[in-house]
């Protein structure tokens, strides 16, 4: 996939941010796995990330964790972090997140989906609309954290892909945020129940500001 790499020098701030995210990689993957209902302990998750397997964990859960690792490693690459946080980037992240589960996990959803625990049924996404909307969000005159949150929540609510939308949306938002040298965004284990509740409310029409304030306060780590 030609993602339009440019070889320009990264600022010291962005290089520090890459190190900061790498130093927290295992914890971030663990937190994302918790949000997905993957029942591994932190030591098991660490083991999977380091060795690719662990006794007593289902193949599905191992694959999900390895996919998260690959998607994070992808965005933390020095070339990739210089690429635009656009629709093509989102699709590539989704492809990595869905690897081994769907043949075309990075392709826009062409089938209806239902989301458990909510009456909200996302309409079928239209590629040109998603491309345009992501560009619009990104070009707003707002703080990077506000833009990252909006990118994340727009992609989740749109359910751009057949599966892996929460995982892909969070990693995509981090691609944008880290490229701005503004920390990272992950829902910590202890904030997951509250996040799920706010997510349903957001899907059902609650304004973005509500879950946005929660994400900014509880899920944003800066340095």
Give the location of each predicted region.
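FIC/Doc superfamily catalytic core
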Residues: 1-223
């Amino acid at each position: 996939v030609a993602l339009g790499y440019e070889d320009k020098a990264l600022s010291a701030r962005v290089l520090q941010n890459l190190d900061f995210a790498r130093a927290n990689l295992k914890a971030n993957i663990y937190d994302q796995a918790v949000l997905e209902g993957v029942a591994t302990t932190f030591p098991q998750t660490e083991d999977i990330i380091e060795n690719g397997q662990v006794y007593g964990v289902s193949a599905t859960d191992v694959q999900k964790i390895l996919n998260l690792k690959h998607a994070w490693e992808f965005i933390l690459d020095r070339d990739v972090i210089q690429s635009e946080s656009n629709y093509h980037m989102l699709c590539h992240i989704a492809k990595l997140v869905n690897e081994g589960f769907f043949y075309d996990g990075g392709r826009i959803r062409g089938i209806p989906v239902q989301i458990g625990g909510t009456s909200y049924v996302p309409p079928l996404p239209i590629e040109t609309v998603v491309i345009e909307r992501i560009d619009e969000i990104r070009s707003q005159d707002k703080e990077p954290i506000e833009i990252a949150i909006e990118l994340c929540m727009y992609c989740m609510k749109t359910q751009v892909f057949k599966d892996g939308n929460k995982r892909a949306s969070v990693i995509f938002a981090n691609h944008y945020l880290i490229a701005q040298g503004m920390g990272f965004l992950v829902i910590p284990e202890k904030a997951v129940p509250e996040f799920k509740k706010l997510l349903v409310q957001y899907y059902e029409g609650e304004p973005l500001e509500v879950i946005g304030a929660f994400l900014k306060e509880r899920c944003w780590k800066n340095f």
